[in-house]
Amino acid sequence: EDVKYQWQDKAYKATKAFSKESEKLGFFGINMASTGCGKTIANARIMYALSDERDGCRFSVALGLRTLTMQTGDAYRALLKLGDDELAVLIGSNAVKLLHQLDKDEKKNTASANGSESIQDDYEHLFVSYEGQIYDGRLKRWLSSSPKLEQLVSAPVLVSTIDHLMPATESQRGGKQIAPMLRLLTSDLVLDEPDDFGLEDLPALCRIVNWAGMLGSRVLLSSATLPPGL
């Protein structure tokens, strides 16, 4: 076993020790480690340690950049062996996915160079890599007209840009805040690389962390260079 990653085992054991207490008292953690030390996988292990094995593990990873979202999804598929019925990767459009594929094949940062992080899309234009579904019931019937929102809510592990969860803290026309709110209500939250955001984004980040905590989510911040201001 690589010595560089042994800290993950320590983090898992330390978190597991108070997983029961976190169900009632909540959890707010910070995972700080240098780039290349395995924070992405450690985040998943920490959230798994907090979860109840009988109920299963459900968590959302929110990032600031779409290219990092795709890379995180790839890491979870490859290293955690998560299938398409367990992991949902939510990005802006098929175009971003194709750019990411070019990046993997050609080892170039094509998606970032084209500024795909700034694309604004509605849920109708999202590409969701996920094949699971909600069991029959009222929620499934309510979401039947929007399959992509159903995927957003139902996936055990969700990796997405944070803008897809942010409507949970805002009043949206047509009830568009309901699906992100349901996601936070039924899963824990990982904010990955929050330092990618500017200071002007801090109020929005604080709102989603506060709202997630009020809904019962356990929250983890993960970063290699988290500034004191955050």
Please report, for each region that a protein language model flagged, where it lies by residue.
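N-terminal helicase ATP-binding lobe
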Residues: E1-L230
